[in-house]
UniProtKB/Swiss-Prot annotation:
Species the sequence originates in: Bos taurus
The record's account of how the chain is modified after translation: Phosphorylated. The phosphorylation regulates the activity.
Descriptive protein name: Calcium-binding protein 1
Binding of Ca(2+) 2, residues: 171, 173, 175, 177, 182
Lineage: Eukaryota, Metazoa, Chordata, Craniata, Vertebrata
Known role: Modulates calcium-dependent activity of inositol 1,4,5-triphosphate receptors (ITPRs). Inhibits agonist-induced intracellular calcium signaling. Enhances inactivation and does not support calcium-dependent facilitation of voltage-dependent P/Q-type calcium channels. Causes calcium-dependent facilitation and inhibits inactivation of L-type calcium channels by binding to the same sites as calmodulin in the C-terminal domain of CACNA1C, but has an opposite effect on channel function. Suppresses the calcium-dependent inactivation of CACNA1D. Inhibits TRPC5 channels.
Pfam family, one: EF-hand_7
InterPro entries: CaBP1/2/4/5, EF-hand-dom_pair, EF_Hand_1_Ca_BS, EF_hand_dom
PANTHER family in the record: CALCIUM-BINDING PROTEIN 1, CALCIUM-BINDING PROTEIN 1-RELATED
Gene Ontology terms, MF aspect: calcium channel regulator activity; calcium ion binding; calcium-dependent protein binding; nuclear localization sequence binding
Coiled-coil portions: none
Length: 226
């Protein structure tokens, strides 16, 4: 079984509790407002419900609240909202809209849903898909594959809807990418103070897989899954 987002989040949550005397943590009141000011909905949700977004640069770290605390039991059927989450992830990677996902895209699709599959797991899945499904996965196959994982491992995980909502709040101009200025503004809102341009550029360089100087949704998912 691949590594799940919930494990690093729990580790970082413990680290946050150990270090909160030396860092400024985003605090939320009973009404759900951050002490540093009222945040937009998805950003506030993320601040309340995540442990730590990123831990690259010390003062540029963003500490976020742990959560997504709905305990899900494996001995039940998928709920409608969980099926919709699977459908949304499937649509994201059904690039030519033919109703199939290529097995090469399955790893990124799983990461979008909050799973960090190992290389061995991806190899095994690819072999299974190539042997039994002709190298492509339709939605029913996808539900059969991902449903048990969703039932067994989604407690404390970041779902695709939460990631997409948060990405939209970072991507203020709606062009599908997060720029240096957009990331700096989001961090200012979460931290309550401005982060230096050089620090922001370092963060973007670290997560910018294609080297275009901006963060797209796939790169954002990887950043949030660290």
């Amino acid at each position: 079984m691949g590594n799940c987002v919930k494990s690093p989040l729990r580790n970082l949550s413990r680290k946050m509790r150990q270090e909160e005397t030396s860092y400024t943590v985003v605090q939320t009141s009973e009404e759900g407002l951050a002490a540093s000011g009222e945040l937009p909905g998805p950003l506030l949700m993320l601040a309340q419900n995540c442990a730590v977004m990123h831990n690259l640069l010390g003062p540029a770290c963003i500490f976020l609240r742990k959560g997504f605390a709905e305990n899900r039991q494996p001995d039940r059927s998928l709920r409608p909202e969980e099926i919709e989450e699977l459908r949304e992830a499937f649509r994201e990677f059904d690039k030519d809209k033919d109703g199939y996902i290529n097995c090469r895209d399955l790893g990124n699709c799983m990461r979008t849903m909050g799973y960090m599959p190992t290389e061995m797991e991806l190899i095994e899945l690819s072999q299974q898909i190539n042997m039994n499904l002709g190298g492509h996965v339709d939605f029913d196959d996808f539900v059969e594959l991902m449903g048990p994982k969703l039932l067994a491992e989604t407690a404390d995980m970041i779902g695709v809807k939460e990631l997409r909502d948060a990405f939209r709040e970072f991507d203020t101009n709606g062009d599908g990418e997060i720029s240096t200025s957009e990331l700096r503004e989001a961090m200012r809102k979460l931290l309550g103070h401005q982060v230096g341009h050089r620090d922001i550029e370092e963060i973007i360089r670290d997560v910018d897989l294609n080297g275009d100087g901006r963060v797209d949704f796939e790169e954002f998912v990887r950043m949030m899954s660290r």
